[in-house]
Each structure stands twice: as C-alpha cells, then as structure tokens.
C-alpha cells in the first residue's frame, strides 16, 4: 500500500495511555439499564432511520445493514422486550426516501419539488435531494404493526400547508385489485404496484 509498516509496540504504547481514561467509562450497560428499570427510572431509547430500511423487515435489498425497528432497542441494550412499555413512532406528513428503492407515492413533478424545497429535504452530509411523495398509509400501517407502536407523532404538517390538494395512499393496485396490506418480503409487488 506504499505505506510504512505498522510497528505493533508503538501502537500498544500509544493506546495503553488511553486505558486509564477509558476504564472508568466502561460498564455492563445492560445491567445499568436493568437496575434503572428496577428502580423505576425512566429510560429512553432513540432509533434512527425508518422501518422500511430495516435489514429484516424493510424493502430488501434497499435497506441499511442493521435493524431499525423498535425490537432493536431491546436487542441492542440487552434488556428484555417486555420492558419496552411505550413505543413511539415518528413519521412525516409526507414520505421521503434517500437513494434508490421502491417508492409507490413518489412525486417526480412540481409537488415533489415543492415538498423537497419547503421541507428542506436535502442530505445533511451530501446536500443531495431526497425523493418525496404522499403519505403512504399502507406502509405506515405495516410500520405500526412491525414496531408495536403505542403512539404515533406526525411531523412536518406545516410543509403541506401551501398545497391546494392533499393526497394519501390508502391502497395499492395490482392488476386492478386493491391491496390494503402488503408484506415487504415480496419486493416484486412494489415494482408492479401503483396507488
């Protein structure tokens, strides 16, 4: 690689100095959380990315490399799922997606442009425009089920305030048949469906 060789002793010496700094901050997190729960403390877990990006429950292969659904809070923290007594989902009043993948309600028109501009739908790092479209209640219903949501917060309602007409997807059409629930294990369906 045209780089000088790594000298193990130098690396060990450098990182050994960090041991004393880090040691006091290392603990069995699952035990700390379990004790906090036992002592009636409020514990908040925060997830990132949407359900449809979940490696197991998303629109594979257009997913991330991890679990984004609420069950991962229990898995990642080492507490049992029965300790998750409130699961709050958050969605926008419209849908956005980064990159490729199925997007049945995508608006590749002036509506999409409006949502992108008014909703500031640009990637934080890249500045790339996100794809935007109408709220898809079929996907939302799936997300509610997969995550066992107890509450749902809807954000960015103000973005829709300048539109004369609002649309919601309440079903998919597949060869003239209306579908109101979809299993995301069948990606082929997303490629042929319309709203």
Predicted features and spans:
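Short, hydrophobic/aliphatic alpha-helical segments
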Residues: 29-53, 112-126
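Conserved small/polar residues in nucleotide/adenosyl-binding loops
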Residues: 185-192
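Long, low-complexity N-terminal extensions
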Residues: 14, 75-77, 176
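Short coil/turn segments at secondary-structure boundaries
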Residues: 5-9, 48, 88, 100-107, ...
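Conserved phosphate/anionic-ligand binding catalytic regions in large, soluble enzymes, centered on
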Residues: 42-77, 95-98, 124-148, 154, ...
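Internal alpha/beta core interface subdomains
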Residues: 1-32, 43
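A structural-propensity feature for long, helix-poor, extended segments
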Residues: 80-131, 162-184
């Amino acid at each position: 690689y045209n780089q000088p060789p790594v000298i193990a002793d130098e690396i060990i010496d450098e990182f050994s100095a960090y041991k004393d700094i880090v040691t006091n901050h290392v603990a069995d997190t699952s035990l700390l959380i379990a004790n906090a729960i036992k002592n009636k403390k409020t514990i908040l877990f925060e997830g990132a990315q949407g359900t449809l990006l979940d490696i197991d429950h998303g629109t594979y292969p257009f997913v991330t490399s991890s679990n984004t659904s609420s069950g991962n809070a229990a898995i990642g923290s080492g507490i049992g799922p029965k300790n998750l007594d409130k699961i709050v989902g958050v969605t926008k009043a419209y849908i956005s997606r980064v990159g490729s993948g199925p997007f049945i309600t995508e608006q590749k028109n002036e509506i999409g442009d409006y949502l992108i501009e008014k909703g500031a739908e640009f990637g934080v790092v890249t500045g790339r425009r996100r794809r935007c479209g109408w709220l898809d209640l079929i996907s939302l219903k799936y997300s509610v089920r997969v995550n066992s949501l107890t509450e749902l917060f809807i954000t960015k309602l103000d973005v829709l305030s300048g539109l004369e007409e609002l649309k919601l997807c309440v079903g998919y059409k597949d060869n003239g048949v209306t579908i109101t629930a979809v299993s995301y294990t069948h990606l082929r369906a997303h490629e042929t469906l319309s709203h």
